[in-house]
Amino acid sequence: MFKISRKNYSDLYGITTGDSVRLGDTNLWVKVEKDLTTYGEESVFGGGKTLREGMGMNSTMKLDDKLGNAEVMDLVITNALILDYTGIYKADIGIKNGKIASIGKSGNPHLTDGVDMVVGISTEVSAGEGKIYTAGGLDTHVHWLEPEIVPVALDGGITTVIAGGTGMNDGTKATTVSPGKFWVKSALQAADGLPINAGFLAKGQGMEDPIFEQIVAGACGLKIHEDWGATGNAIDLALTVAEKTDVAVAIHTDTLNEAGFVEHTIAAMKGRTIHAYHTEGAGGGHAPDILESVKYAHILPASTNPTIPYTVNTIAEHLDMLMVCHHLNPKVPEDVAFADSRIRSQTIAAEDLLHDMGAISIMSSDTLAMGRIGEVVTRSWQMAHKMKAQFGALKGDSEFNDNNRVKRYVAKYTINPAIAHGIDSYVGSIEVGKLADIVAWEPKFFGAKPYYVVKMGVIARCVAGDPNASIPTCEPVIMRDQFGTYGRSLTSTSVSFVSKIGLENGIKEEYKLEKELLPVKNCRSINKKSMKWNSATPNLEVDPQTFDAAVDYNDLENWLEQPAAELAKKLKKTANGKYVLDAEPLTEAPLAQRYFLF
């Protein structure tokens, strides 16, 4: 038997079972749990390599031929290290007709046993050795303000947005709402020319009939926002329509507590599922205790990224940002007080810990309205780094193995937002049958800058050099548009998400859309238990005087490797026996200046 050192093997084929790799310049490591390729039969493209005619490439099978369950792929990514909520493992990825068709071993079944997908005459190959592959990310809090957010999103690893808006109107600068048929149609028509998956939220304030007609127009969900009025009646009616049409409802609650307090908002929901935006509250919501919504099973809590992670600069940047985003006047004392009420260091500090406990399930941006669309992925991993640095390993993790923490955090911007908006059967993970929206990363750039972004099997954005060079690696090497962003390729490699009733009513033909429209589904049958790796419901209370966020002792158990008793000694204990969730602000972040000086 031929033997090879792990170092030599990883140099040739990428790391394998039992090996670990560091994620960017963070303190996080992932350990390969399994390898679905076959030692000695690895698929490798290139001169003198295995994927040649008569060897690893089959020369006789046509595109629609099958041998057992194995069929010829359009694209095979070889020896990929998959980082997904489903696991951290190595495999070949087969893509066909824009979808993930196989995960396992590629090759020529006429020569090799155990082949799951065929490399044939019709197959292109992408060399995945030494790279990490994640599902395209989702951002479910996008203000539809300008089209240039799309390449920024793609360059940050985001391939799907749930958005709302009308362009640079003041309503959209504050709220993610495409109100009424005209604006839903306009948004879908604009998305037809952009290389990203998109769905749009309509206004969730009003009586049932005008809300319903927006869903018929194709809105994939509803948004309740305090700037339009987040009253108990609005919440009840929006959820009533959503229950009838199977769409999601997102909410930005009442900061000023004008129509009631957090308990009144919770009561108006009547146990019906709702996606709570920026649950900490700096982005908006009942001051100071909207964070308490993490304890309810019917609320799917999310964060927006300006408060993530908590750093020494977080508080300082928020006041002016908030004044601009919500059309406030710094000369009006009441407006200044409104802004001040939303920025609380205590709840911002607690937010990171609640993410690490799995109590906040989703990450998003709030792009151009107190958030950055290109930093959803980056800030998620900065927060994971911060939590490991300050609190140690997550339960079940060990040296060079942060797999549990990594799965928790990757789920926050992939599968969980997809579940929340009824699109998890299409996107959100690397699983057979889903759209082939995949992001490749060099490990040293993981979480900061992708190597390429694939949309439904076609590269949309990629690191590429001077177009006039003799080889593709000559400087300047930057992210550039690829063929997936042009012509009919653009409309055939992205989709738009709409309501089922809108699709059935023929909006594709009426609006003259070229992209495939896919209906959202199962939006009303989910709850927090549906959130992968992030379903904790701690009994959190926010002190209205000190703004301290505290949980019970049992909420600290089964979180970290360090015993709950040891952690409890480090946390402040309240008069009623709870433990305050607090952490120091980060003074130096990974995935930051080292990657973005130029």
From Swiss-Prot:
Top-level taxon of the source organism: Bacteria
Positions of substrate binding: 225
SUPFAM superfamilies per the UniProt record, alphabetical: Composite domain of metallo-dependent hydrolases, Metallo-dependent hydrolases
Protein name per UniProt: Urease subunit alpha
Record-linked NCBIfam families: PRK13207.1, urease_alph
Binding residues annotated for Ni(2+) 1, in chain numbering: 141, 143, 223, 366
One term under GO cellular component: cytoplasm
Record PTM text: Carboxylation allows a single lysine to coordinate two nickel ions.
